[in-house]
């Protein structure tokens, strides 16, 4: 018994013209839930401070490294921001999802990587995971 692949109708036959995709949990797998990973990395206060303070880093008003350095200093942690940054370098592309993106593009849909990422993580995803060229629009 074989499992057939779903057929993606041509974009010309659908009112849908574009598909927006997130990274974490959609195009890539991160394993450990984020709150748990942050708690393991620096403790509960660190996890909460990172979640509470992440908005500026996601908006590009502060780098992730600057946020990490500030939180480590404010909490008096004996951790290095550069070591903590490695937590943001954990993700594995989901090959099934990436194939779906290629299939959508082949069927004529515009694909958009619509994800909130800090600059450091975005660069890592592009350089190490190969996101450049996956979607039609990724900015």
Listing of model-derived features with the role each one plays in the protein:
Residues 16, 108, 135-137:
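Short, well-ordered alpha-helix to beta-strand connector turns
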Residues 22-25, 60, 113, 138:
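Generic structural signal for small/hydrophobic residues in well-ordered secondary structure
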Residues 82-112:
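Short, acidic loop-to-helix structural element flanking the phosphoryl-transfer center
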Residues 116:
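Cofactor-binding loop segments of dinucleotide-utilizing enzymes, especially the Rossmann-like FAD-
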Residues 119-139:
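Substrate-recognition "cap/lid" segment bordering the active-site pocket of phosphatases
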């Amino acid at each position: 018994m074989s499992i057939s692949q779903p057929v993606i109708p041509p974009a010309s036959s659908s009112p849908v013209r574009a598909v927006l995709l997130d990274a974490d949990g959609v195009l890539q797998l991160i394993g450990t839930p984020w709150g748990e990973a942050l708690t393991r990395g620096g403790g509960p206060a660190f996890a909460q401070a990172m979640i509470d303070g992440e908005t500026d880093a996601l908006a590009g008003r502060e780098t992730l490294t600057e946020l990490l350095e500030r939180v480590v200093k404010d909490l008096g942690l004996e951790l290095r921001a550069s070591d903590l940054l490695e937590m943001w370098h954990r993700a594995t592309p989901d090959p099934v999802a990436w194939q779906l993106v290629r299939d959508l593009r082949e069927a004529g849909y515009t694909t958009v990587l619509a994800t909130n990422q800090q600059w450091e993580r975005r660069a890592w995803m592009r350089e190490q995971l190969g996101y450049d060229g996956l979607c039609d629009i990724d900015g």
